[in-house]
Design a protein with these regions (language model features):
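The feature represents the first ordered module of a protein
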Residues: 48-115
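Short, structured motif recognition centered on aromatic/hydrophobic residues
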Residues: 35-40, 111-125, 152-153
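Short, well-structured alpha-helical patches and their helix-loop capping segments
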Residues: 108, 117, 140-144
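Acidic-enriched, low-complexity/disordered segments with a strong bias for Aspartate over Glutamate
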Residues: 11-12, 29, 45, 89-91, ...
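Short acidic, glycine-rich loop/turn motifs
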Residues: 30, 101-106, 127-132
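Charge-rich, low-complexity N-terminal segments
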Residues: 1-78
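Mixed-charge, glycine-accented linear interaction segment located at domain edges/termini
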Residues: 122-161
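Residue-level detector of solvent-exposed, low-hydrophobicity positions
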Residues: 10, 17, 71, 103-106, ...
């Protein structure tokens, strides 16, 4: 997925999370001609999702208008996370759209938000925390129920199909 310069600088400034104990998963999706991969940890409280990446290996012709429509539809569909998603960045030439939680979760020490990056053939889902005192952005787990995880995987698959 080709990122805009602004998005690339932003992604480079997000530190990787501490995901020891998370299980890595990798699934081939023959119908979609792609792969689903990421890492998560299951517990009695549900699922902690580190990151999920759905990539289509067979390139699909897609205009930016269609990509934007898919992003808008995804932001409406994914209404079961704690914060609603809105488009915050896009790059027409690079065929890239970024959705983020608005308003994000805030407390005295941090700001947290969900982020879904949508490219022509790839979708990345993660949660990011900005720690105010250290002024550091770091990836953190996204807390979901099993049902929310299955629905999220279904919704992102529909967006890239």
């Amino acid at each position: 997925m080709k990122l805009s310069r602004k998005a690339k600088r932003y992604d480079d400034s997000v530190l990787p999370g501490e995901f020891q104990g998370f299980e890595v998963f990798h699934r081939v999706d023959a119908e979609l001609e792609g792969t689903l991969e990421g890492f998560l940890r299951r517990s009695q409280d549900g699922v902690q999702l580190g990151e999920v990446v759905l990539e289509r290996h067979a390139p699909k012709k897609l205009s930016f208008a269609k990509l934007k429509n898919k992003a808008e539809a995804l932001s409406e569909q994914v209404n079961y996370l704690k914060e609603r998603l809105e488009i915050v960045d896009h790059d027409r030439r690079g065929m890239y759209i970024q959705l983020r939680s608005l308003p994000p979760y805030k407390d005295d020490t941090q700001i947290q938000f969900n982020e879904i990056s949508i490219g022509k053939n790839k979708i990345v889902v993660k949660r990011i925390a900005f720690y105010r005192k250290e002024e550091v952005k770091q990836q953190v787990p996204l807390q979901l129920s099993e049902r929310e995880l299955e629905r999220l995987l279904f919704d992102i698959r529909q967006a890239i199909a």
